[in-house]
């Protein structure tokens, strides 16, 4: 295992997954407020 390949794969994955989770949680929060 090389230390150069891990960041090149791990960083973009976190850069895509973290904003997706943040947007999903915010979207669900807005939906709950609209329903109530």
Curated annotation (Swiss-Prot):
Membrane topology: Single-pass membrane protein
Transmembrane regions: 6-28
HAMAP family tied to this protein: PSI_PsaI
InterPro entries according to UniProt: PSI_PsaI, PSI_PsaI_sf
Name the UniProt record assigns to this protein: Photosystem I reaction center subunit VIII
Record-stated family: Belongs to the PsaI family.
UniProt KW keywords: Chloroplast, Membrane, Photosynthesis, Photosystem I, Plastid, Thylakoid, Transmembrane, Transmembrane helix
Organism: Acorus gramineus
Subcellular location field: Plastid, Chloroplast thylakoid membrane
GO biological process: photosynthesis
GO cellular component, one term: photosystem I
């Amino acid at each position: 295992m090389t230390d150069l390949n891990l960041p090149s794969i791990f960083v973009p994955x976190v850069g895509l997954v973290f904003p997706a989770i943040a947007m999903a949680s915010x979207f669900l929060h807005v939906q709950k407020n609209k329903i109530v």
